[in-house]
């Protein structure tokens, strides 16, 4: 692309924004695109010399942006720009197209030169040949299956693509019938309500602002079909409006039936209980609630509170479900969650069908005009609140009045003078660099303009911002500083690449920070490497944890250095890495610099110093603690409500208050700390509403749930972090992220309104006035920022039969873009949830029932059929929620965190394994009471783990409700976990769920390729990015990582794209056979398999190579085409066998989907056995590891322990007093007072195991335990160093058996059979003194100790017993052998002999994976193996003794 001389060079703006009015950076069509990398033009293959800024008129920039955005989301494949454009304007379009992932080309000459932009076509990517070589054993396993059970004609035809649409009505009726029991509201008839009872709340009700408008509200609802009610939070609208309707119907003798929806489960239960109490009724009579998997309703219930999701599921059973309903109230409409918008779309349609139905929308901060337009001029009732005055304090006021400062703010003030000097030196560096590096461009560029431009930024952006976490500069010895400075200067000024070796050496051996700054210029090694174009060193630095957001004294980040000096490859690399970091756009310092004119000089300086000291992306817990202390010591009594974005921050702040901050921890009797989160149990929430005892202050840590759903009347002080966690989704890249973003103005006003309910209050806002002015008016509707696959499934169940999904969603209050809907529908077709006519398949109906995204739902259902459910439940819930590994800020810790993640993978080339084993090790640490220390040590989030447990419980509950997991017999929890220990099988379920997220290894070019990507890289957080973890990562890290892969296929959870580079994270290496059997559609075209001869005759070109040599070798290979991209070349016999195995699997899967509860047939069992044999054999032949212990059942949590289904519970010794829900119902405040939990309040685990406590819990994992089996046997190996809990240092006597410890299993060897007979008669045993201490300790530390007996040389186990006393000093004369120690009591459970061959398959990881029978006396068994060994006795016919050999 020839660049005309009129394009004047100018460095990019430091934040990556474009120059001129366009702005907007290099990315997704903001208002410009000035900063993107220039393409090298269609002709030139070389790198662009420099990324010069392209200056064109702002109108052209904006017009081009709009045109390209429309094109991106539209149907056209190609778009042409007029030939009247100048070459500069064309250059701008080329660059912007490239940054948007489009292909642009210019054709023609002179005045006829025009430019076309095309969308990338998947087929464009040439890829390496996809092959699959089967081992002899694999072929044998498939042959045996096919000989015994050939693929039947019925199976074959069922798996052919449909040619015509089936009878939709019949299928739909059958499937709706099948799934209607789950999570629906029951069908009652309207009745006249009973008279309300008088209660203690009557006077309070009458004082509510809404009470005055009772008659007006009832009258307007009677006269209109739709009514909007806007009332300030706490005005009483949620609890009173449904009661006004009940009372009116009672008075006039009119039957009614009312549904009232809430956005959250917690609110639905809380409001229902409150309303029942106000009417002096028990919950479940007139007033009830229903949430997913839990309900309290009866035939008398006339007012049901439910979640939006439950009402939607009810409507999915058909429109007639509302025929007996008189009123539907949709509360908190302003939250605009996807279900409420979706519900309104459906309800608007239903209002025409049900003339008597009334719809009431209630909200605190409604975008009223939108809804008036949507429902066609309906009346609006406004209810004023009666709050007292609330004073506002913004960030600058807080800093000024409280005098808050921190080390970094002080340091910043000192650094300012130094910084000016650094800028001057930096400018000299640039000019020196340009003298040596770019003589030809030197004539055009005046160096002065560089410094002038950056002087405009006052004192140069976030210069000292990232030195803050580094103690290094002040602690380093002078020779180190001198040495580092010299190295960085040499690299920059003399292109001395060898100096990097010394830099890496100093970072690792002398503890110099990887973000060390050159003392005279403030440049880091990453900036210097980026500006100089040293790509592999940039990669190395990033993998060592270098901060890509660090800024030099002129405000430039490494990315700006790379752009300015024309290093396009590094620009791509840094942008792709930055794009994949989970941050919203929160930087406030730039705002202060640009718009801070109305700030006083003092406030401006304060804010600038603060923003230099703290990263806006996070929540400043230090500042919150400072404020808390100030409030508690200088303000009157009154509850404090603190709004935080998520559970992580809530737990972090709670721990500071209760344990870490001495000012509070030493005075816990003065505070009650409560936590509110939507996934939390209601018991804590009920206590929040009660007034605390005198002299005790209530501190409530909450997410945005306390904005509207829950009103706490005694709140006087609100601390608002200004943040919320929001899921956002890029529909074009299919990437979902949980981002922390700024709240909307409407939310900020709501939060302020929570103070001053009982007297004047204060709202402390941890953001500036300027930030507040720049906030969005209302939150973006979830419908516009969420992945729509789940919603499209629900649409099919709600929309009329012949209405397309897109047509139905276009009726929403703010419809999502058509392209996003189309992409979602296409994805559902790809994963077999829908057919070509957009009708749901059998799989689709089940996926609509599961509370996770469809691809994860498919993964879980495949795991049920493959019988490896537990590991997949854990992995699926983790992927659905978030990565439990936290990213530390310091570079040295980043490396340690990476190493920890790597240890959890156990050499399996799988990030998914790291997630699974981290969860298992955390559960083990939790049962041993040291999970907090464990999480800190392994860089894990305690909060995330607790949420994952609750999600598992909910998902398992849904599988039970749908009939996939039975209570007992075939299909019970044990049966669906038969293969959980086999990692190859677990990965098959992962592959089935992850498809089409696959990449292929091109060994020849050492790159990864995808269906639409020519080049894919591992994200630095993936363990696969650093195969052999070395202290210094290899220079060509990605290539080394690719070469180390044992197979040619990878699955990934998420791909982030930026420019020409795609990053994949959460990957696992899988075998080609897994891809061939589990990927692609279930229904393959009849010509999917092309035999070699026909392959030649058809003349289909071989796209893998042009060389004749290769043509000859592929000529005798068959082709098996699974989809447009997956096209395998393999031996004809292998192709035919694999196609048949695929057909057997898919027909089995289809049968299970049609009848989940039906018993398995012989064919089904044989198919699964063959698949497992094939997967295991191929996994072994690829040299992939099979770690032990992955199938361990998680520890069941008793009902008080489930964090989501119940109150939060932690066995951590430091925390348990703060957040254990004690059996005596004491409040949190009282709990805080107790320094240690009383043992009496924890019933011993033994009784729990016997089912005496909580005998029935349908959602719990434990309803399937036999007397022997105990799922408490989890004792997980912790892969990170020192798995044992930190010891107290002093030997302590154990007071009583610890309740929450795992069960232990030991082998007892006897020299003769007579001793065993004595033991069985008298119930006693003795062992050698060397075993005594071990057994005694196990007896005291665990809930149960099982002893498995074997007489040496007998070839049998002779039974097992339970140890029922500790070992005493008294010895027995009965034993014939000398050298035995004291006697202890045992309780024999099974006395039958079990031949060793029954246990051949059991290997003990705690004895070098030897078979269990090869054990010495006193050998401990790994708990899961012990449990499996005991279960073998269940298979022996009862009472029938096997004789010993």
From Swiss-Prot:
Its EC number is 3.6.4.13. It comes from Mus musculus. Residues 627-799 form the Helicase C-terminal domain. The keyword NADP does not apply. GO terms for molecular function: 3'-5' RNA helicase activity; ATP binding; ATP hydrolysis activity; N6-methyladenosine-containing RNA reader activity; RNA binding; RNA polymerase binding. Residues 1179-1189 have a biased composition (Polar residues). Keywords: ANK repeat, ATP-binding, Cytoplasm, Differentiation, Helicase, Hydrolase, Meiosis, Nucleotide-binding, Oogenesis, Phosphoprotein, Repeat, RNA-binding, Spermatogenesis. 'Ketu' is a harbinger of misfortune in Vedic mythology. Residues 15-48 have a biased composition (Gly residues). Its main location: cytoplasm. 3'-5' RNA helicase that plays a key role in the male and female germline by promoting transition from mitotic to meiotic divisions in stem cells. Specifically recognizes and binds N6-methyladenosine (m6A)-containing RNAs, a modification present at internal sites of mRNAs and some non-coding RNAs that plays a role in the efficiency of RNA processing and stability. Essential for ensuring a successful progression of the meiotic program in the germline by regulating the level of m6A-containing RNAs. A motif (DEAH box) lies at residues 331-334. This is 3'-5' RNA helicase YTHDC2. Present in male and female germ cells (at protein level). Highly expressed in testis. Not detected in spermatogonia next to the tubule wall but is strongly expressed in spermatocytes, suggesting that it is up-regulated in germ cells upon entry into meiosis (at protein level). One of its GO terms (cellular component) is perinuclear region of cytoplasm. It is found in: Cytoplasm; Cytoplasm, Perinuclear region. Residues 1303-1433 form the YTH domain. It catalyses: ATP + H2O = ADP + phosphate + H(+). Residues 1-50, 1179-1303 are annotated as: Disordered. SUPFAM superfamilies: Ankyrin repeat, P-loop containing nucleoside triphosphate hydrolases, R3H domain. Residues 218-384 form the Helicase ATP-binding domain.
């Amino acid at each position: 692309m020839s660049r005309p001389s009129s394009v004047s060079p100018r460095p990019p703006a430091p934040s990556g924004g474009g120059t001129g009015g366009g702005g907007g950076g290099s990315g997704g069509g903001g208002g410009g695109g000035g900063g993107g990398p220039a393409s090298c033009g269609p002709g030139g293959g070389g790198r662009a010399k420099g990324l010069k800024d392209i200056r064109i008129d702002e109108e052209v920039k904006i017009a081009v942006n709009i045109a390209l955005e429309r094109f991106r989301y539209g149907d056209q494949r190609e778009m042409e720009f007029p030939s009247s454009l100048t070459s500069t304007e064309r250059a701008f379009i080329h660059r912007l197209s490239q940054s948007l992932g489009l292909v642009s080309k210019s054709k023609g000459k002179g005045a006829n030169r025009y430019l076309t932009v095309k969308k990338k076509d998947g087929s464009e990517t040439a890829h390496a040949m996809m092959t699959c070589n089967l081992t002899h054993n694999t072929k044998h396993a498939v042959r045996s299956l096919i000989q015994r059970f050939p693929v039947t004609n019925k199976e074959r035809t069922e798996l052919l693509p449909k040619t015509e649409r089936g009878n939709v009505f019949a299928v739909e009726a059958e499937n709706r019938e099948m799934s209607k029991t789950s999570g629906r509201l029951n069908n009652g008839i309207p009745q006249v309500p009973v008279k309300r009872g008088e209660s203690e709340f009557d006077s309070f009700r009458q004082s509510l602002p809404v009470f005055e408008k009772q008659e007006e509200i009832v009258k307007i609802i009677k006269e209109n079909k739709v009514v909007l009610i806007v009332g300030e939070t706490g005005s009483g609208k949620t609890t009173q409006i449904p009661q006004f309707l009940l009372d009116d119907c009672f008075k006039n003798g009119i039957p009614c039936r009312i549904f009232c929806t809430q956005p959250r489960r917690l609110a639905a239960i809380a409001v229902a209980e409150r309303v029942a109490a106000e009417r002096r009724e028990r919950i479940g009579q007139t007033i009830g609630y229903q949430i997913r998997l839990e309900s309290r309703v009866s035939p008398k219930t006339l007012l049901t509170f439910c979640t939006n999701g439950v009402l939607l599921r009810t409507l999915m059973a058909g429109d007639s479900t509302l025929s007996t309903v008189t009123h539907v109230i949709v509360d908190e409409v302003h939250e605009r969650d996807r279900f409420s918008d979706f519900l309104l779309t459906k309800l608007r349609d239903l209002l025409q069908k049900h003339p008597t139905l009334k719809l009431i929308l209630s909200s605190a901060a409604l975008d009223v005009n939108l809804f008036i337009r949507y429902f066609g001029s309906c009346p609006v009732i406004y209810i004023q609140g009666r709050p007292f005055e609330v004073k506002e304090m913004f960030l600058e006021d807080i800093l000024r009045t409280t005098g808050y400062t921190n080390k970094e703010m002080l340091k910043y003030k000192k650094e300012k003078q130094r910084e000016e000097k650094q800028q001057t030196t930096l400018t000299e560096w640039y000019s020196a660099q340009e003298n040596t590096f770019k003589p030809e461009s030197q004539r055009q560029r005046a160096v002065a303009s560089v410094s002038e431009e950056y002087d405009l930024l006052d004192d140069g952006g976030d210069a000292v911002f990232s030195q803050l976490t580094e103690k290094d500069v002040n602690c380093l010895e002078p020779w180190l500083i001198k040495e580092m400075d010299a190295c960085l200067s040499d690299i920059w000024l003399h292109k001395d690449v060898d100096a990097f070796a010394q830099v890496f050496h100093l970072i690792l051996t002398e503890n110099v920070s990887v973000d060390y700054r050159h003392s005279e210029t403030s440049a880091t090694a990453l900036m210097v490497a980026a500006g100089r174009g040293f790509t592999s060193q940039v990669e190395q630095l990033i993998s060592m944890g270098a901060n890509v957001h660090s800024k030099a004294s002129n405000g430039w980040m490494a990315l700006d250095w790379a752009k300015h000096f024309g290093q396009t490859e590094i620009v791509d690399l840094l942008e792709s890495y930055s794009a994949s970091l989970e941050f919203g756009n929160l930087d406030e310092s730039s705002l202060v610099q640009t718009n801070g004119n109305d700030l006083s000089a003092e406030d401006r300086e304060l804010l600038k110093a603060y923003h230099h000291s703290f990263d806006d992306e996070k929540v400043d817990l230090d500042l919150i603690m400072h404020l808390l202390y100030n409030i508690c010591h200088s303000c009157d009594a009154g509850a404090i409500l603190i709004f935080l974005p998520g559970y992580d921050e809530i737990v972090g702040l709670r721990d500071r208050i209760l344990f870490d901050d001495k000012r509070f921890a030493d005075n816990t009797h003065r505070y009650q700390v409560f936590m509110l989160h939507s996934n939390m149990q209601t018991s804590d929430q009920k206590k929040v509403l009660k007034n605390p005892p005198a002299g005790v202050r209530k501190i409530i840590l909450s997410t945005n749930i306390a904005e509207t759903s829950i009103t706490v009347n005694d709140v006087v002080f609100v601390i608002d972090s200004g943040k919320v966690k929001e899921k956002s989704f890029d529909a074009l890249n299919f990437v979902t992220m949980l981002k922390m973003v700024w709240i909307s103005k409407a939310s900020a006003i709501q939060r302020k309104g929570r103070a001053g309910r009982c007297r004047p209050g204060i709202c402390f806002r941890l953001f500036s006035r300027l930030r507040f002015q720049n906030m969005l008016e209302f939150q973006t509707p979830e419908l516009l920022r969420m992945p729509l696959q789940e919603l499209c499934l629900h649409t099919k169940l709600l929309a009329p039969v012949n209405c397309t999904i897109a047509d139905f969603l276009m009726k929403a209050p703010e419809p999502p873009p058509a392209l996003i809907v189309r992409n979602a529908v296409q994805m559902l077709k790809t994963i077999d949830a829908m057919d070509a006519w957009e009708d749901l398949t059998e799989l689709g109906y089940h996926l609509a029932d599961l509370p996770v995204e469809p691809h994860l739902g498919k993964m879980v259902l495949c795991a049920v059929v493959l019988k490896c459910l537990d590991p997949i439940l854990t992995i699926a819930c983790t992927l659905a929620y978030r990565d439990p590994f936290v990213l530390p800020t310091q570079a040295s810790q980043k490396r340690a965190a990476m190493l920890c993640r790597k240890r959890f993978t156990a050499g399996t080339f799988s990030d998914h394994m790291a997630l699974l084993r981290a969860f298992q090790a955390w559960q083990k640490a939790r049962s041993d009471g040291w999970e907090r220390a464990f999480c800190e040590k392994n860089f894990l989030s305690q909060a995330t783990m607790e949420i994952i447990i609750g999600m598992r419980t909910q998902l398992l509950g849904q599988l039970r409700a749908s009939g996939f997991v039975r209570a007992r017999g075939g299909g019970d929890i044990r049966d669906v976990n038969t293969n959980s220990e086999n990692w190859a099988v677990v990965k098959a379920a992962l592959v089935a769920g992850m498809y089409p997220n696959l990449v292929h290894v091109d060994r020849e070019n050492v790159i990864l390729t995808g269906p639409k990507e020519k080049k894919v890289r591992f994200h630095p957080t993936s363990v696969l990015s650093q195969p052999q973890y070395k202290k210094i990562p290899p220079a060509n890290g990605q290539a080394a990582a690719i070469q180390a892969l044992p197979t040619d296929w990878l699955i990934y959870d998420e791909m982030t794209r930026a420019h020409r580079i795609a990053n994949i994270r959460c990957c696992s290496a899988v075998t080609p056979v897994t891809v061939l059997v589990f990927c692609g559609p279930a229904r393959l075209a009849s010509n999917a398999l092309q035999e070699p001869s026909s392959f030649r005759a058809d003349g289909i070109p071989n796209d893998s190579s042009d060389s004749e040599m290769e043509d000859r070798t592929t000529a005798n290979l068959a082709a098996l085409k699974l989809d447009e991209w997956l096209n395998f070349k393999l031996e004809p016999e292998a192709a035919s066998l694999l196609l048949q195995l695929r057909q057997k699997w898919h027909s089995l899967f289809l049968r299970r989907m049609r009848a989940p509860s039906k018993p398995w047939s012989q064919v089904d069992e044989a198919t699964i056995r063959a698949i497992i044999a094939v997967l295991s054999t191929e996994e072994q032949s690829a040299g992939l590891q099979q770690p032990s212990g992955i199938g361990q059942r998680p520890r069941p949590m008793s009902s008080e322990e489930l964090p989501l289904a119940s109150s939060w519970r932690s066995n951590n010794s430091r925390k348990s007093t703060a957040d254990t829900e004690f059996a005596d119902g004491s409040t949190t405040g009282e709990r805080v007072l107790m320094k240690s939990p009383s043992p009496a309040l924890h019933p011993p685990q033994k009784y729990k195991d016997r089912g005496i406590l909580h005998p029935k819990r349908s959602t719990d994992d434990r309803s399937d335990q036999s007397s022997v089996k105990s799922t408490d046997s989890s004792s997980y190996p912790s892969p990170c160093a020192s798995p044992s809990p930190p010891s107290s240092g002093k030997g302590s006597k154990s007071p009583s058996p610890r309740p929450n410890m795992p069960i232990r299993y030991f082998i007892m060897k006897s020299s003769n059979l007579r001793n065993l007979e004595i033991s069985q008669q008298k119930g006693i045993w003795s062992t050698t003194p060397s075993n005594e201490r071990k057994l005694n300790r196990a007896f005291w530390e665990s809930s149960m100790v099982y002893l498995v007996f074997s007489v040496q040389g007998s070839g049998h186990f002779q039974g097992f017993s339970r140890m029922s006393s500790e070992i005493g000093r008294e010895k027995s004369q009965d034993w014939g052998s000398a050298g035995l120690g004291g006697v202890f009591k045992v309780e024999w459970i099974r006395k039958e002999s079990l031949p060793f061959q029954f246990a051949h398959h059991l290997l003990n990881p705690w004895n070098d994976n030897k078979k269990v029978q090869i054990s010495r006396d006193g050998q401990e068994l790994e708990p899961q193996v012990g449990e499996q060994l005991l279960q073998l006795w269940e298979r022996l016919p009862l009472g029938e003794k096997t004789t010993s050999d």
